[in-house]
Every structure is written in structure tokens, then in C-alpha cells.
């Protein structure tokens, strides 16, 4: 039974930010998108995130030693990939222009790190002239549903196209 802190409905999604039960964590809170957990964070130092965000951060920062790199994140969620991570440049693309303000005010409780572009992920990778060292694909409309236009061969070709020659593509 959740005690909802904030509920926001936009033209694209329903967002809920509220406390969650995670033993051993300081003030843990969740960011739900369409009733599915999109992001987790707490006030520990360093903060705890969802397992997959911890894993992505470990791959990019520890295993690949990314520093001073350009990272594209398709699907913003709670903006936790770049949270308190100053060593790289992040660009988030999300179809909902309201997600950043909601995440900053109610979930992160601080400014999100990185550039935010309100656009459809497929259109962005199809038309962008920019190139990135990594593309992280994290686009869900619910816990088990990826928008169908983001699982096409053309989408993946365009996601690859915006990579620099030695770039990596990571998908959740």
C-alpha cells in the first residue's frame, strides 16, 4: 500500500513519486511511470539506484572507464544514470516534455545532470547529426511494454548510426 507523495498526469504518462520500502536505505523513493517502477533512489552516500542502473553505471564508468564522453540516454525515467556523475556528458531524450521537471522536483530533489531533449526517440536517432560514445536504450511505456516503433530494425539501425566508430550500445 503506497502513500503517494505526488501524482502527475500528462498527455503521455502517469507519474507517481513516493516512498518505498527498501530495508537499509535512507529515505528510499520510487518513480513510477504508468504504474511501473522506472527508477529508485535514496539519500545514502553514494545513493542506491535500481539494480540495472547500478549495472549500467558499472559498465560505463568502471569496465569501459568512460570519462569525458558523450552518452545518449533514450528514455529519461528518473534521470539516475547521470545522477551525481560529473565525468561524462549526458543527453536524455524522452517523448514527454514534463518528465524532467517532475523528476527534478519530486524524485531527485535536485537538478538532473545533462541535456534534456523532448522528442520521440526514433525520430531523434533518425534525424540527429550528433554522434555519441554510448547509446543507452531504456524506453518503456510500462513494465513489460516497449513502444512498437522502438523495436524495429530501422530504429536499431538508426541507434547504431548515432554512435561514434568505437561507440557502444546498451539496452535495458
In which residue ranges do the predicted regions lie?
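Short conserved loop adjoining the S-adenosyl-L-methionine
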Residues: 123-129, 144, 161
